[in-house]
Amino acid sequence: MNTFKKIACSFMALAVVVGCTACASKTFDHKKAVKFCEDEGYEMYDDAEDYADAFNEIIIGDRPGDRAYIHAVKDGAQDVYDSVFNRFEAYPECDVNEATSFIFFDDDVFVQGYVLTFDEVKYAEKIFKDYARRFKEDGEDGEEKGYSYFIREIRYSDNMKLYCGIYQKNNSILFIQCNYKKASMVDGICEHFGVISPSEA
């Protein structure tokens, strides 16, 4: 092999390594979550405590039709994890760098979602595995396009289904829950984030 070819091959190998490293370092995108909320008319909250109050009011049905979301970093992100995502202390204590959460509840539809970015990959892995283990009897797991997933579809009645999906990509988690009679809503949300829908479970 002549010198030119050796140099060309070296650059190609380097490009592959760099490309793979870039792919491996990607996490779920908070900007996508914020755009989804803006497009769907969710009310933005700046303060994690105010958002937690709104979340609790919406989830028990005191504010039918309301939509709320928050995007927070550092201490605010930690507060979102502690007081909203992990409000029942079902998951371990984790150090969170960035968090986006959204919720919508009306008579016949319920939607909640989270994008969480942690200090370390081990936190994301722990939460993903805990959730999958807890609901392994009625879910399906796998890997696709650089992320792991665990999805569930449960029929409550002819007029209501529960769709849940948790997705891990490196040190980040995406969680989506949707209660609705049709798969179209959760399918649309998952398409926005580029992940497999729980309706495929």
PLM feature spans:
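Bacterial N-terminal signal peptides that target proteins for export
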Residues: 1-11
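C-terminal motif of bacterial Sec signal peptides marking the signal peptidase cleavage site
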Residues: 19-22
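Bacterial signal peptide processing site
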Residues: 24-26
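Short secondary-structure junctions
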Residues: 38-60, 79, 135-145, 194-200
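Short, compositionally biased low-complexity segments enriched in polar/charged residues
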Residues: 44-111, 123-127, 152-155
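Short Gly/Thr-rich strand-loop-strand
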Residues: 121-170, 185-201
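Short, well-ordered beta-strand elements
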Residues: 167, 171-179
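A short acidic/glycine-rich loop-to-helix N-cap element
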Residues: 176-188
